[in-house]
Amino acid sequence: MSVFAPIARELDIFFGFSWRDWSTTIIPGSIFAVGAMRDLPPATLVKNYLFLVTWLTPYIYFFNLSNQITGVDEDKINKPDRPIPSGKVTLQGAQRRWIAAFSTFLGIALYQPEFLPETLCWIATVAFLCLTSYGDHWFGKNCVAMTTGTWALLSASWKAIAPATPTSDAWVYAVSVWAGLITHIQDLRDMEGDKAVGRKTLPLVFGDMGSRLIITFFALPAACWVLSLAGIFQLAPVTLGALHAILGYRVLRQGGPRYDHKTYMFYTYIFCLILAFCALDGLGLKINAESLRALLATTGVSLKEL
């Protein structure tokens, strides 16, 4: 057996646990971090970004393992291809990997104490989601946990590259609240599994159509308003307004779980695009198709994907 075979297997397992969440973690964190790279020497830029990747990897892996270890019954219904329900990894194997991911994540913060607030915030958020009943309620699951988790992600992503600024902090807070307001979209596609495990998500509490009306006519306008408070919406008002309108239209369509999954993915692309606009402004660049394409190319994302 090749010495690289165990490494390849672990990478494959990591991908199996985490790939669904890259567009809300590793990719947006990397995009936002680009905005902090202005005037940095190339060697410093590369070193700091590699450190960020080192932090982001256990950030997402620790969460995915925690979520999927405690959510096997739900995954058997909603996502049977995941490593545990598919039999690719045993529950005990996932638990061993959880210990490694958690130890690595916390160890990085102890080595670089300036990341301790974001690290502890994320650990507390994951515990809240996976170990308490409040993490199964629509308000706790999205309004609270998505807000705090996004803050940890974006704050650390910027700080890994350069010190935070008042502007970057305003962006982080605004985008975090934006995410907490409209991530209920993810629950429109998973109602069967959520009902089976006793979750109280927005669609299960207010009904399918009721939740869609709340998201479209309350959460989306409120989210746009929050972005405007930090000056983000003003960076590309026509584009962001149109994208949120399209998102609202898709939410109201009731096209079934597969359609709702695509709507959720569309939401994650808007998330990445918002951070790309912030990054371009942080670099002092004019926002246009060419500058956006160049920025996204540094993170492996194309305009077609967005």
Curated annotation (Swiss-Prot):
S-S bridge residues: none
Catalytic activity: (2E,6E,10E)-geranylgeranyl diphosphate = (-)-cyatha-3,12-diene + diphosphate
EC number(s) given by UniProt: 4.2.3.206
Main location: membrane
Topology in membrane: Multi-pass membrane protein
Annotated keywords: Glycoprotein, Lyase, Membrane, Transferase, Transmembrane, Transmembrane helix
Transmembrane helix in keyword set: yes
Function: Diterpene cyclase; part of the gene cluster that mediates the biosynthesis of erinacines, cyathane-xylosides that show unique biological activities, including leishmanicidal activity, stimulating activity for nerve growth-factor synthesis, and agonistic activity toward the kappa opioid receptor. Within the pathway, eriG acts as a diterpene cyclase that converts geranylgeranyl diphosphate (GGPP) into cyatha-3,12-diene. EriG is unable to use geranyl diphosphate (GPP) or farnesyl diphosphate (FPP) as substrates.
Sequence similarity: Belongs to the UbiA prenyltransferase family.
Stated name of the protein: Diterpene cyclase eriG
